[in-house]
C-alpha cells in the first residue's frame, strides 16, 4: 500500500481514535447545520418587505443549502434521528431567540419554558449518543 493512514489522530494535544475524531467532527457539523438552520427563517422574514424580497429569498436559499450540507456531513457518523432532533432543536431555539431580539416576537414565560424543554431534550440526546 502506497498511502497508509494511522489509526490514531492527534486532537487538542491528546491521542484520539478515528472514531472519536469523527464523532467530534459530526457534532461540530451538526452545530453548524443548526446555526445555518436559523438563517433561512430570517431570510423568509426579510423577504416579507417588497424592497428586500429578493435579498431575503437569496438569504433563505443560501442558509437552507448550507444547513442541509452540514446536516448531511453530520449524518455520516451519527444516527439520523439524533441528528435531525438536535438540528431542529438548535434551529428552533435559535430562531426563537433571533425573533425576540431582532423582530419583536413576544417573550412570555410559556415560550421560554418551551425553548428550555427543547434545549434540555437536545442535551439529553447529546449525552446519550
Regions found by a protein language model. Give the residues of each.
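Intrinsic disorder/low-complexity segments
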Residues: 6-10
Amino acid at each position: 500500500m502506497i498511502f497508509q493512514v494511522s489509526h490514531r489522530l492527534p486532537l487538542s494535544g491528546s491521542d484520539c481514535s478515528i472514531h472519536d475524531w469523527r464523532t467530534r467532527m459530526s457534532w461540530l457539523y451538526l452545530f453548524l447545520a443548526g446555526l445555518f438552520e436559523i438563517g433561512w427563517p430570517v431570510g423568509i422574514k426579510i423577504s416579507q418587505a417588497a424592497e428586500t424580497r429578493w435579498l431575503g429569498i437569496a438569504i433563505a436559499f443560501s442558509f437552507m443549502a448550507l444547513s442541509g450540507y452540514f446536516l448531511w456531513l453530520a449524518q455520516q457518523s451519527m444516527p439520523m434521528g439524533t441528528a435531525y432532533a438536535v438540528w431542529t432543536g438548535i434551529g428552533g431555539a435559535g430562531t426563537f431567540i433571533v425573533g425576540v431580539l431582532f423582530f419583536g416576537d413576544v417573550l412570555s414565560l410559556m415560550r421560554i419554558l418551551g425553548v428550555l424543554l427543547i434545549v434540555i431534550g437536545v442535551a439529553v440526546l447529546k449525552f446519550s449518543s
